[in-house]
Amino acid sequence: PPANTARFSWDNTVDVDQYICQPSSAPTPDDATGAVSLSVSEVNEHAVIIPNLEPSTEYTVYAFYNGAICARATFTTKKGKPVGYTEYNGVEALIADWDNLSGNILVTISADADLSNKSEIPAAVTNIVFWGEGATQPKLAVKNMQTLGAIDKIEFYNLNISALSNDCVIAPNTEGSSIANIEITSCTIENYRGIVRMRKVNGESSLKLNIDDCIIRNLGTKGTNNYYGIVQ
């Protein structure tokens, strides 16, 4: 489900007139107290859109008929955009302000974009998130991304991260720099020599790499030597 809504549907043979949706950590309701009544159209369509949900949260929805639970389902909402970040709408806006970047940066990407010519993240950046907007993953080309200072996290979400040449996604190569965390979630990664190549970055042994819900294609196919794979 998206970050803030979910569609709950049930079989045509099941009668439902109310529902309760709550975090899965909450106890199972004893009755229909506080339940939301379905509209005539929702009853006829055997489906309802549940609004006002929190991102990255597991919920259980209980379907009721005549005051009794008749069905239930558990789901987890998708991630939501981080708060407290300076947001740039598109890679072009980010590049235009590149030398002034600092603090927490959120880049919202809704169309295919090329960032391969801007590989050195400015030293004043603390966290940077590349956020793919929409149901279809926008393509983002990056090349040997690194940081000029100490950065807490580089994150990619809902993107098709594609190589244009014989590169890695992230390849720190600056003395005195460090990366604490790299997160790649709900992305497609394709045609890279490797994902992370460690070279001269300090503290490389403590770097945490988290790849979750991703498709990886043709990893290492561009490599002509031994340093290719997830991490080199």
Set out the residue ranges of the language-model regions.
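Extracellular beta-strand-rich solenoid/capping regions of secreted or surface-exposed proteins
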Residues: 3-4, 114-130, 137-180, 193-203
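Conserved aromatic anchor
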Residues: 4-16
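Detector for repetitive beta-architecture
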Residues: 104-106, 112, 127, 153, ...
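Glycine- and acidic/polar-rich repeat regions and solenoidal domains
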Residues: 10, 164-176, 190-211, 217-232
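Feature marks extracellular polysaccharide-active and adherence modules
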Residues: 110, 131-133, 157, 162, ...
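Beta-strand-rich modules
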Residues: 50-71
